[in-house]
Amino acid sequence: MEIIYDTIIIGGGMSGLKTAYDLKKSNFKILVLEARNRFGGRTDSIKIGDGWVDAGGQWLGKKNPNLKQLCNELKLETYKQFYQGKTVFDIYDDGLIKSFDESSPNFDLCEIGLGYINPIIQTIKEVGKNIDFSKCSKESPIMLSLEKLTVSEWLRVCGYGESVKFFIWFCKMSVASSSDDISILFFFKYINSINGIESLFISDDDCTESDRIIGGSSMVSERIVSFLKDDCKLNCEVTLIDQISHKNGRLVKITTSKNEIYYCRNVVSTIPPMLLKNVIFKPDLPIEKQRLKNEMEMGNTIKVIVIYDSVFWRDQGYNGKSQSFVGPIYQSFDNCTNDLSVKSIIGFINGKEEIKYWYSKSLEERRSAVLNQYSKYWGPKALNPIHYIERNWSLDKYSAGCFMGVCKSGDIISQCNNYYTQPHGNIHWAGTETSTQWYGHMEGAITSSKRVVNEILKTSLKSKSKL
């Protein structure tokens, strides 16, 4: 006898699990199908002794109310990211390496030699606030003109050519793609979603990396899975979503790569747009949604975690954060657990060309380059870690990269943006790429689940009213 679910959620990352969590609390018969052999999606906490390191998404801030509320509900505690001390800046044409205390009341962009980007920040604010991404129009002159330009091209057109080097770095750090590869309209969309540009560069209590979850960000998924129990399955890669073949036309038939078949009334897909090309849809997706799956790309990042037996950088008055135009690590952070059971620094190698270059090297060559870079910042103790861990998210079959899906120059946002979330029959869409708030962040994933749950609840009420 066929089991008919109210809703099947495809994807067991944060957005999928939170969607399932809320629907189950509303007495829906739900099932989560996750393609991987683990839950968590683009979050992945690795146990190290009595502690952990996060190989995926790990930060939240005070401007992330939905994620903070969920942590409270799941009885998860957070702690402050360590920023006490000096930040290293390796961003100067003369090769000098300087350090500044970002918590100083006198600290600003001028002090570190980046005063020239202040006018650009103001321009970005002025232009960005005039774009309403919730009401994209295919005829919008400002959208069409901006989307044809990359970030680098727009800077040159506006007379800010001297800032291109900074924004090549900045885009790699914020969206894991070069400013030569993404449209300025997409950049505005991202900046608007996180409430401004400054919090991505200067670290304080208002920044995007202000707090962490004790036990690791995967604890969110673990707690939800323990609530869902048998209502979630691993190793279930969905290959077909069929809305037309079942004898009862209101049901959706879902088939996995193992030829397992499930039936439901509604589907929530949290698959990133660019990975939808691996799924057959009957009937096919509208042309705009097809463009999203075919033309969007994922950012590229290698997350490097170096574990030490002491916090020698803190002992010297540094906070473990570095900003570098040189690399291979373009940005690093203190990555210690709250109880110092694991003492580590994380760093990021971001961007398509950077990943291509560094993955042409051996693991030992990458390791040596990273440790030598750290030794220039914090001394010879950086050369002797007890563990060196890499996670190249571009090699992850079910993510195809990190941090988020990005858009090239062209017209995909102006023509297709409204189709990110528009249901296709009984298929609804969630995931951080569908969120207008905190796009690409864990908060964006949770926000998207809130929206899609409301959609499902309204659909359910309408269905009942017809009976």
UniProtKB/Swiss-Prot annotation:
Q: Which InterPro entries match?
A: Amino_oxidase, FAD/NAD-bd_sf, Flavin_amine_oxidase, Flavin_MAO
Required cofactor names: FAD
**EC top class named in words:** oxidoreductase
Gene3D superfamilies in UniProt: FAD/NAD(P)-binding domain
Superkingdom per UniProt: Eukaryota
Which EC number applies? 1.4.3.4
* Molecular-function GO term, any one: monoamine oxidase activity
Q: Which reaction does it catalyse?
A: a secondary aliphatic amine + O2 + H2O = a primary amine + an aldehyde + H2O2
S-8alpha-FAD cysteine: modified positions: 402
Q: State which residue ranges cross the membrane.
A: none
What UniProt keywords are attached to this protein's entry? FAD, Flavoprotein, Oxidoreductase
Q: Which family does it belong to?
A: Belongs to the flavin monoamine oxidase family.
According to UniProt, the name of this protein is: Probable flavin-containing monoamine oxidase C
Natural source organism: Dictyostelium discoideum
Name of the gene: maoC-1
